Amino acid sequence: MTRRRWLRRGLWLAAFGCLWINVCDDPPLRTDAYLLDVASDAAVVGLVTAAPSASQLTVRGADGAVVATAAEVEPVRRHQLRATGLQPGNSYRYEVVAGAERFAGVLRTPGSAPDAPVRFAALGDSGGQPWWVWLQRTPLWHWPARLGWLPDHGPVNAVGAELAAWKPDFVLHLGDVIYPKGQHAHYMSGFFRPFAAVLREAPVYAVLGNHDVMDAGGRQLLANLRTRESMAHDGGRNLSVVRGPVRIVIIDCNGSYGGRRYEAGHPTHAFLERELAAATEPWIVVASHFPMRSASRQRDRADLLLAMLPQLVEHGVGLYLSGHDHCYQRFGESGGDEPVMVVSGGGGKDLYEVRPDARAKALDPAFHWCAIEARDGRLQFEARAVGGRSIDAFEVKLPAGTALERIAAKNPARAQRIGQLR
């Protein structure tokens, strides 16, 4: 009798243990409708469905009249619906129907004037995962994870909520969108759910971080956050976003793309040189995942200081944004030859310590995001800790003096636009 009792207990224990073994597939990636890109006359709405389906996009103006439609006729899981014929500086409501599901959101087209106001948010290293994501392939946790019953990572949720409340025109993500290896299985819990509210109303343009490229070279990020049109140029790894008087140049400096050292001959070096030489916008912002200077774990990056910094100085770049270190750092003052260098890696992953550094103007190991706004001839920057505390604030000044003289000699169209804003 005792032997049977122990046998039953052993079988129950073995059965319970089987519930904790990774034998299931990861839950399929699925999202709400989200904005991939918005231009003055068009917008692209993305959607990932759990199973293949057709989809229909309807865009309505303020009076409720239909102004644009688009459709994916063939059943697919990954949808990109492009609405055209929109008007600059307008707000529209959109609806996506895919199978039995309906999604709705708001899109705002940017103004077409060269000095149109623009506001955008920037952050990096937000891809922290909740504890249960490592158990979502077990029989016990698979269906709760698949049905979205489990909570997401708290700091990432808090950042996402504050971004949505601020209502930016778009979000610039500085890389490491998803930890630990940028896999599709972790996008729902680490990105699409925490940022769902802001994604419904503003596109996210993301830099490829080192964790984003650890699996399949970053193809997951490119599939989730690039339009098909942007993939035609540099495979979507490098791109520019232009809004009014601001150009943001997004570049890939990962060692898996073009070699470990950033130098002349690197494909990103060539792309950046072309973009900087052709840009006519008064303010240029360059965004990479990797800091040039650091007062935290990553330290200075010599190849960027030697090969990229001279490019930025030569072309009068005002701001260099990066992530990688999980904290806030600022080096430099606006108005000098070098751009202001900001490290913003406090988007939700575990924070890093900072160390005293005489070169740094601001240091703070806090979860945060950055609010950037161009209006009335000024570009204002503020880093905001979660909860509302202001970490740092400054103005990105227009090129002047010898910097403006260099620009006028090589790019008179840009120099003229700078003069018009003064």
Regions found by a protein language model. Give the residues of each.
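N-terminal Sec-pathway targeting helices
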Residues: 1-14
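Proline/serine/threonine-rich low-complexity linkers at boundaries of modular beta-sandwich domains
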Residues: 20-28
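Binuclear metal-dependent phosphoesterase catalytic core
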Residues: 29-42, 46-48, 55-56, 241, ...
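N-terminal active-site segment of His-dependent metallophosphoesterases
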Residues: 30-56, 61-63, 71-78, 87-185
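Extended active-site neighborhood of metal-dependent phosphoesterases/phosphodiesterases
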Residues: 34, 70, 83, 91-114, ...
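Short, solvent-exposed loop/turn elements at domain surfaces
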Residues: 44, 54-56, 128-134, 214, ...
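Residue-level marker for buried hydrophobic side chains located in beta-strands
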Residues: 120-122, 171-173, 206-207, 286, ...
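Active-site glycine-centered loops adjacent to acidic/histidine catalytic or metal-binding residues
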Residues: 125, 175-176, 209-210, 251, ...
